[in-house]
């Protein structure tokens, strides 16, 4: 009897140990440590992490609305980290002026960060600590709403001349307003802050799209690159199918007259659906060939600007091929030159979209992250029945000959969901970030709405040319239906990125005021 009892005890202990071990193993499989907090309003915008002077931890700016019966009030909430490494608490809450159309963050030379507000006729600054609003300047812009329906986060601020200071760029109908922050600015914010900027206008008009019944205006896309090899960034845009540049001169300002940069290949600065014929109609998609200049930046790591062109060939609405051509810049006698034919290109089955240029392994060369999906009749019918469509994620890398291979170095599948009843579509999570501070980015992909797969970045070694591990780590969590609501940022500035998640209208009601932070263990 004693022997039987002892045996039962041993079996019980073994089972307990096994179950406990499995539970611990399951717990260890979680890749991130999670923390969360809730706010007392509905979050409406992507969360904005910003650096604050003399603070190792970044501050979170959270935009949303307060609902009171039939009235909604837009507000900005400032959240700061407490002593606990993952907990954020409210520091200030500010109501936006009802005339605010758009906003951005602006860092002054004193390293103080303020909010830039744009209305239909003026620029103002908002102090996040005091809530005070100060007029910066009257401004002409293409945004002519006195009481906008919503507030947009727009890219109003950019270091356009490469001096390390934030500048302001506001499009108007005929010109581009450029406010250059100069190094002689005072170390404090006061009512004369406009004196800290050189105000100028570049002859870069808005993009006009006109049909027989309406006309619309949009921002002109621009680039800032050094194209004359004087060490200064120049202001570049596409005009009438030609590359046009305003050269940088003294004090970080730009020349008043533009210069044409001759290129040996044809391209457009407008997507094909904005190009109209003599009859005012858009292009015939049964016989369409179009090349759009997508980006100008150094891609192959030689510190010379390169050009990326998106090429579209269509023989029907459901029969379209999209590829990307890359023209690598060269310096000849102080001039930026390109070959007539593309140096390399990227093609893949399906329709390519959402291309991003990212240096995945910190070698100075850009990898290409791009998605692909089929839009044939059978795929559309299948998607309507299932409520989702498969989407491939590819990463292409330059080889030793500065050529993108025919096959991607990374290929995985995610799903894009949509609802016929609500008309809303979900987006998968597709994010690159460095979770362990080794300067090699990981790839994060969602699997449904409850799991992330993490493919660890790694060094290329002899016999192993892979940038990512073949097997993924897993993390289970409640993901937002819209993967764009997940962002990556190094919140405590330790070289390791965190994930910040919020939720939207496609998610459960109780999640709409919740913020989740994921930090690698």
Regions found by a protein language model. Name each.
Residues 1, 21-22:
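Coiled-coil-like amphipathic alpha-helices with heptad-repeat character
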Residues 10-17:
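Bacterial N-terminal signal peptides
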């Amino acid at each position: 009897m004693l022997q039987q009892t002892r045996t039962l005890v041993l079996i019980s202990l073994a089972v307990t140990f096994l179950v406990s071990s499995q539970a611990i193993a399951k717990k260890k499989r979680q890749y991130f440590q999670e923390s969360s907090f809730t706010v007392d309003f509905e979050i409406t915008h992507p969360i904005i992490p910003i650096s604050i002077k003399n603070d190792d931890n970044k501050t979170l700016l959270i935009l949303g609305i307060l609902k009171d019966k039939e009235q909604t009030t837009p507000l900005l909430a400032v959240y700061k980290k407490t002593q606990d490494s993952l907990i954020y608490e409210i520091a200030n809450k500010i109501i936006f002026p009802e005339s605010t159309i758009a906003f951005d963050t602006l860092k002054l030379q004193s390293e103080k960060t303020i909010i830039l507000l744009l209305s239909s006729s003026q620029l103002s600054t908002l102090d996040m600590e005091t809530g005070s609003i100060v007029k910066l300047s009257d401004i002409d812009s293409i945004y002519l709403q006195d009481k906008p329906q919503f507030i947009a986060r727009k890219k109003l601020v950019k270091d356009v001349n490469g001096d390390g200071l934030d500048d302001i760029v506001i499009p108007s109908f005929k010109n581009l307003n450029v406010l250059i922050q100069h190094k002689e600015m005072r170390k404090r914010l006061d009512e004369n802050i406009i004196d800290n900027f050189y105000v100028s206008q570049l002859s870069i008009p808005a993009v006009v799209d006109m049909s027989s019944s309406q006309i619309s205006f949009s921002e002109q896309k621009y680039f800032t690159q050094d194209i004359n090899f004087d060490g200064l960034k120049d202001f570049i845009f596409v005009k009438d199918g030609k590359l046009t540049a305003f050269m940088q001169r003294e004090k970080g300002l730009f020349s008043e007259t533009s210069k044409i940069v001759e290129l040996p290949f044809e391209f457009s600065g407008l997507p094909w659906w904005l190009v109209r014929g003599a009859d005012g109609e858009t292009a015939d998609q049964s016989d369409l060939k179009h090349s759009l200049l997508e980006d100008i930046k150094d891609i192959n790591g030689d510190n010379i600007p390169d050009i990326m062109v998106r090429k579209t060939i269509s023989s029907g609405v459901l029969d379209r091929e999209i590829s990307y051509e890359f023209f690598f810049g060269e310096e000849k006698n102080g001039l930026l030159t390109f070959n007539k034919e593309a140096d390399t290109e990227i093609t893949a089955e399906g329709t390519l979209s959402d291309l991003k240029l990212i240096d995945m392994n910190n070698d100075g060369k850009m990898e290409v992250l791009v998605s692909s999906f089929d839009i044939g009749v059978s795929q559309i019918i299948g998607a309507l029945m299932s409520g989702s469509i498969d989407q491939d994620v590819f990463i292409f890398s330059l080889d030793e000959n500065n050529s993108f291979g025919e096959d991607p170095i990374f290929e995985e599948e995610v799903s894009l969901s949509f609802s016929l009843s609500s008309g809303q579509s979900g987006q998968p999570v597709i994010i690159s970030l460095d979770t362990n501070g080794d300067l090699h980015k990981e790839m994060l992909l969602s699997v449904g709405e409850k799991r992330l797969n993490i493919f660890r970045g790694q060094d290329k070694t002899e016999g192993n040319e892979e940038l990512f591990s073949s097997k993924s780590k897993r993390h289970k969590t409640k993901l937002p239906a819209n993967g764009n609501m997940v962002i990556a940022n190094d919140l405590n500035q330790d070289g390791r990125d965190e994930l910040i998640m919020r939720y939207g209208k496609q998610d459960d009601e109780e999640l709409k005021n919740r913020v989740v932070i994921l930090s690698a263990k």
